[in-house]
A protein has these predicted regions:
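Sensory coupling linkers of modular signal transduction proteins
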Residues: 96-156, 163-164
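Sensory/regulatory domains in signal-transduction proteins
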Residues: 1-126
């Protein structure tokens, strides 16, 4: 596992199709990718298979609704290691205010936040395996929404509460 320092901020930008248009040095250092290896590639190049597809469905639904997304995510490095982050993804607007892409800032998370996310994601992954590939994202997202409703919080509230020290 690659551990982020408290002051590490991983920054990346993508176009509307999710292709990387910018990464900062911290992104390159933590992910072990050189800039030329990721520019123009889909941002899911760092997606770890332990994060359910339903979480990414929620992220895209949230962004398409014009809102920012917060989530604890496990990412994959170029050499097969992983790192956990608190991700904040927002719309990236051009000078005229039109959405031109997406802007993501990721930072370190506590072991407690990782534990909570891991437990949630394990159940979502179990549901995705049972649902089959095509139905997997919707099935696990439905379960996630139900689990959050039982706790009377949104996924964002759950995420941010789990990240408080």
């Amino acid at each position: 596992e690659v551990r982020l320092q408290e002051n590490d901020l991983i920054v990346s930008k993508t176009d509307m199709k999710g292709r990387i248009t910018y990464v900062n040095r911290t992104f390159m250092r933590i992910s072990n990718y050189a800039e030329h290896e990721v520019m123009g590639k889909q941002h899911n190049v760092v997606r770890h298979p332990d994060v359910p597809r339903g979480v990414y469905r929620l992220m895209w639904d949230t962004l398409k609704a014009g809102n920012e997304f917060f989530g604890v995510l496990k990412n994959l490095t170029a050499d097969g290691h992983f790192y956990w982050v608190l991700a904040n993804v927002t719309l990236d607007r051009n000078a005229t205010g039109e959405v031109a892409g997406y802007f993501s800032v990721r930072r370190s998370v506590s072991p407690d936040a990782v534990r909570e996310a891991s437990d949630l994601y394990a159940e979502m992954l179990r549901i995705e395996r049972q649902a089959g590939s095509a139905a997997a994202p919707e099935a696990s997202l439905a379960w996630l929404k139900s689990a959050m409703a039982e706790r009377m919080v949104s996924f964002e509230q759950f995420t941010l509460a789990s990240c408080r020290d």
